[in-house]
Amino acid sequence: MSVAPLKNDVFLRALLREPVPYTPIWLMRQAGRYLPEYNATRARAGSFMGLAQNPDYACEVTLQPLARYPLDAAILFSDILTVPHAMGLGLDFAPGEGPRFAHPVRDESDVAKLAVPDMDSLRYVFDAVRTIRRELDGRVPLIGFAGSPWTIACYMVEGRGSDDYRLIKSMLYGRPDLLHRILEINAEATRHYLNAQIDAGAQAVMLFDSWGGVLADGLFQQFSLAYTRRVVEGLTREREGRRVPVIVFSKGGGQWLEEIAACGCDAVGLDWTVNLGTARRRVADAVALQGNLDPMTLFGGAQAVRAEARRTLDAFGPVGKGGHVFNLGHGISQYSPPEVVSELVDEVHTYSRALHAG
């Protein structure tokens, strides 16, 4: 595929801790239900899966936030559960209930049926990546992503989201051998999946370990981080003549920051409970940091959003040899006022320039 040269590579350079003129910003779930235009496209598609599995629709919603805001990266519109869906678990999004699987993985016979899916079954994702790259025309980089092996295992075993993770933790403590087998398959599948996204044109990739923080110390390292590391170690790290940065985000994982930073990634995503300055000292600028405004700040109005953006940037401090990508500490709420996002992006771009001077 012939690709246009990047007009704005500030996001990629910040991830690699290279000098940039300002702090780049993008938002987790930036293409989502808080945007009226997203809801209109989803209505045309008929369902979430109808949206995600149609490369043209996926491209359309990926680009929608960039039409509103001068964001520094686009992120592929998809879902972390496409991989287990390709394994035959039957993903469905029930209205008002979120994702659920028709065939959850609960016992030895279920685990025996699991296998790394043929990547051709996920071709719609890679077609979407190619379509988005073409339509971006070098405007900003495109981020690909996947769920971490542990996080997608949570959904596979529970069958849906969970408040207490009773089923997967029952397996963890009672049949750890079964859980390790699931995680091995997930890690291999995720490695292939992300590499296929990179081959299709993703210029950075992110692993969402959304549920890593529900694990006890020691078990996080064994059941989450070890398999995240397997994925990271197997990724294509150079494409189109430049490095493909890898971001790892473990929500609730602040206590393990140093260990996450040592997994081979280029950047660590932080939730809003971690002080950026403290985190920076802990990793000693060995990796870039991404985050970490509380998503609920967006409900405080423009003045509060601008003040909290400045406070977050000040916490990281003068950039120097570090790297900072501004983001929320988790995905943007569907109820967020779109006009306040404009205030956030403007404040980050304007205020951060002084932190990059000299």
Swiss-Prot record:
Q: What does this protein do?
A: Catalyzes the decarboxylation of four acetate groups of uroporphyrinogen-III to yield coproporphyrinogen-III.
**Location(s) in or outside the cell:** Cytoplasm
Which Pfam families does the protein's record reference? Answer: URO-D
Cystine crosslinks: none
Under the heading InterPro entries, the entry gives:
UROD/MetE-like_sf (IPR038071), Uroporphyrinogen_deCO2ase_HemE (IPR006361), Uroporphyrinogen_deCOase (IPR000257)
Q: Which GO terms describe its biological process?
A: protoporphyrinogen IX biosynthetic process from glutamate
Protein name stated in the entry: Uroporphyrinogen decarboxylase
Single annotated GO MF: uroporphyrinogen decarboxylase activity
**Family, per the entry?**
Belongs to the uroporphyrinogen decarboxylase family.
The record's subunit annotation is:
Homodimer.
Site (Transition state stabilizer) at 79
Organism listed in the record: Bordetella parapertussis (strain 12822 / ATCC BAA-587 / NCTC 13253)
Name its pathway.
Answer: Porphyrin-containing compound metabolism; protoporphyrin-IX biosynthesis; coproporphyrinogen-III from 5-aminolevulinate: step 4/4
Q: Does the keyword Phosphoprotein apply?
A: no
| Catalysed reaction equations from the record | uroporphyrinogen III + 4 H(+) = coproporphyrinogen III + 4 CO2
Keyword terms of this UniProt record: Cytoplasm, Decarboxylase, Lyase, Porphyrin biosynthesis
E.C. designation(s): 4.1.1.37
Where on this chain does substrate bind?
Answer: 29-33, 48, 79, 155, 210, 330
Kindly list the organism's lineage: Bacteria, Pseudomonadati, Pseudomonadota, Betaproteobacteria, Burkholderiales
Q: Top-level EC class, please?
A: lyase
One cellular-component annotation, GO: cytosol
